[in-house]
């Protein structure tokens, strides 16, 4: 089922999500939620979605794609379901890159993110996940996990001359390419 995506200004996006409880791992409730999240993300061509974006207060993010219309130059990111994540930067180097968000439609901004990270957490059955990510993969993970701590990407922008409406800043780009 396609869920409604909350938009910036909805106070639910500012909450800190609690961890997914152990008793929820492997449940049909969790399976249905994840299926709904993927259906919702794919319906709008997104590359990631966090449970708080659909009003669910849980530390759950999904992400991944082979090819993205929204980010045509981005390398593929493996489809991932990540619960109760922990991100560790591998070195202090950051790089800036354009970001958009399904909860902040029509806007893009330049955001600094760690270039290389390790992320850990669990899959839906409670099995541990640990991966190293670089570049756009690392950016997507950091962006989605920000939703779990009530943070939207505009709060990370340091140069507001690089933040604006897509149809103004990128007139040749698809106006729906905002995630």
UniProtKB/Swiss-Prot annotation:
InterPro entries: Peptide_deformylase, Peptide_deformylase_sf. Fe cation binds at residues 101, 143, 147. Keywords: Hydrolase, Iron, Metal-binding, Protein biosynthesis. Binds 1 Fe(2+) ion. The active site is at 144. Gene3D superfamilies: Peptide deformylase. It holds the Pfam family Pep_deformylase. It is an enzyme of class 3 (hydrolase). The keyword Amino-acid biosynthesis does not apply. Its EC number is 3.5.1.88. It comes from the Bacteria. Its cofactor is Fe(2+). GO terms for molecular function: metal ion binding; peptide deformylase activity. GO terms for biological process: co-translational protein modification; translation. The keyword Hydrolase applies. It catalyses: N-terminal N-formyl-L-methionyl-[peptide] + H2O = N-terminal L-methionyl-[peptide] + formate. PANTHER family: PEPTIDE DEFORMYLASE, PEPTIDE DEFORMYLASE 1. HAMAP family: Pep_deformylase. Removes the formyl group from the N-terminal Met of newly synthesized proteins. Requires at least a dipeptide for an efficient rate of reaction. N-terminal L-methionine is a prerequisite for activity but the enzyme has broad specificity at other positions. Belongs to the polypeptide deformylase family. This is Peptide deformylase 2. It comes from Pseudomonas syringae pv. tomato (strain ATCC BAA-871 / DC3000). The gene is def2.
């Amino acid at each position: 089922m396609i869920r409604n995506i909350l938009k910036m200004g909805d106070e639910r996006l500012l909450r800190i999500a609690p961890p997914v409880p152990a008793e929820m791992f492997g449940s049909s409730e969790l399976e249905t939620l994840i299926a709904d999240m993927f259906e919702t993300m794919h319906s709008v061509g997104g590359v990631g979605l966090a449970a708080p974006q659909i009003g669910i207060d849980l530390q759950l993010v999904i992400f991944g794609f082979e090819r993205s219309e929204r980010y045509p130059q981005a390398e593929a990111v493996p489809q991932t379901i990540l619960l109760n994540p922990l991100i560790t930067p591998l070195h202090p180097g950051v790089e800036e890159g354009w970001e958009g968000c399904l909860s902040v439609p029509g806007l893009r901004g330049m955001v600094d993110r760690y270039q290389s990270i390790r992320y850990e957490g669990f899959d839906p059955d409670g099995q541990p996940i640990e991966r190293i990510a670089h570049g756009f993969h690392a950016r997507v993970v950091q962006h989605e996990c920000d939703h779990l701590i009530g943070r939207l990407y505009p709060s990370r922008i340091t140069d507001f001359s690089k933040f604006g409406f897509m149809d103004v800043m990128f007139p040749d780009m698809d106006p729906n390419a905002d995630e």
